[in-house]
Amino acid sequence: MDYICIVAIVERGKADFVVKMAKKAGANGATIIYGRGTGETEAKKFLNIHIESSKEVIIILTEKQKAKPIYDEIVRAGKLKDPGTGIIFTFPISNLLGLHHREEFILED
């Protein structure tokens, strides 16, 4: 079976809602990690103090056939088509270990 990793970077405070909607679209779970950008547009100034905006990184592993509706729902829920709201990308998983307790991730030999 083929698996896909979906990674979305959204504004801080929005990940819980985005994950909730991704689950409604078929995701079985997600990992949320806090992060910050290093790009020039990430640093903002307030009273001559640099403030870096923090982000939430959402990571979802799913079966390939479930990936498209989950991806589409993340884009919709996170409003990722609006400029500056975040990014999303996917990549195939070639090796997977450690999710033995999750039936959908048991690899058949």
Where do the PLM segments sit?
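Positively charged, small/polar-rich N-terminal and surface patches that mediate targeting and assembly
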Residues: M1-D109
